């Protein structure tokens, strides 16, 4: 059963664009040869890292979204781990996240807004305040 995953990885900032493309192509080939499908590939560019990773303060971020089964994802992670140019990676299973978000949306849609409901009892108008009486000014001599 294929599941939906996001694989974010960071490659060294000193790599040429062609080398980055080769790494991406080899990972895409791993997924397709293993029976998975690539939904999208996004190069997010060079960004500053929050902390030093293998003595690098910057890295090129790449996001792969794939449909794959568990053993294929394990193989993909193994290849990321042994590729020296990859300095960091994370794999997140997104189908559970989609289910959770859809459930929250359904709950929110089923709720009726307080502003949409008619008021149960219209507020009674307060009685008008009695008119202020004029004070008679004292006669000055």
Swiss-Prot record:
One term under GO cellular component: ribosome
Pfam families recorded: Ribosomal_S6
Any GO BP annotation: translation
Keywords: Ribonucleoprotein, Ribosomal protein, RNA-binding, rRNA-binding
Chain residue ranges for the region called Disordered: 110-141
Disulfide bridges in this chain: none
Assigned protein family: Belongs to the bacterial ribosomal protein bS6 family.
Purpose: Binds together with bS18 to 16S ribosomal RNA.
Cited NCBIfam families: S6 (TIGR00166)
Protein name: Small ribosomal subunit protein bS6
Lineage of source species: Bacteria, Pseudomonadati, Acidobacteriota, Terriglobia, Terriglobales
